[in-house]
Amino acid sequence: MKSTSGILLFILLSAGAIAFSRAPLYTCEKIKLFKAHGVVVWSTPNRSLGIFYKSSLAIDADGAFRAYHPVDRLGLDSLAHAGHRGNWWALVTDNEEKSGRPILQGDSDPAPGYYVSTTALYNADNSNVRDPRRYVDAAAIPYIVLHPKVLNYARLGDFATVVNLQNGKTSAAIAADESAPNLPVGEASIALAEALGVDSSPRTGGKNGDIAYLVYPGSGNGKPRRVQEIVANSRDLFETWGGVSKLNSCLMASSADANR
């Protein structure tokens, strides 16, 4: 779904083409943290500085106001990705358990008739669990989904930088959701995919390979943030970490080591 603020969001998030091949190389000191589903996750020696990996990008619609609908074709994503009867892992239910019946948005909500879709990161100051605005909107906020093993080193609310290595586009991001252990490493929101120039359809979009993720552990406050805050914090953290040159070197070095 393209929001009316899509053009502005693209301008805010896209820092332009990054010429990785032309960047001067740094010596990259790194530590292998783990490997999951074929993706090796690395850290710089002081892991508070950065965790990075190269992977694919699957599209997550969770938190978007029109993510899921009782009539499956009307939702941004297939209802099967929100769960099934007795196990609704991505929807608010009447008993606030996965076993309950999904709650529909009302007339005063952003998308009446659509289900209330959740994210692992949410606004705790809003005590109304049935309010769709409590969660991180995938259509508006550039967020990444962390694999459970990554959450051993980083936490929800931390900032990140994500790069499309094929076209050089980069985007700031926040960690706002958690994947299941059996799912591949590498998932992001609709808004983040748009900023990277990737097909953002949760049903048919995404990208196989050539996406670099850099997460800054301990950088967030465990709360959702506005786009402007995400951009400003991630930009400063990326520059402090070493920027394009260091990421280029670390990706090349990690690729060589992973193939040994």
PLM feature segments, named:
Residues 1-6:
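Positively charged n-region of N-terminal signal peptides that target proteins for export
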Residues 181-192:
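Short, solvent-exposed secondary-structure boundary/capping segments
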Residues 166-172, 209-210:
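Loop/turn elements at helix/coil->beta-strand transitions in domains of secreted/extracellular proteins
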Residues 171-180:
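Short beta-strand-centered aromatic/proline hotspots
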Residues 20-169, 195-200, 216-255:
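Cell wall/extracellular polymer interaction/catalysis modules
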Residues 204-208:
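Intrinsically disordered, low-complexity linker and terminal regions at domain boundaries
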Residues 143, 174, 212-214:
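Soluble periplasmic/extracytoplasmic beta-strand elements of cell-envelope proteins
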Residues 11-20:
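Hydrophobic h-region of N-terminal signal peptides that target proteins for export
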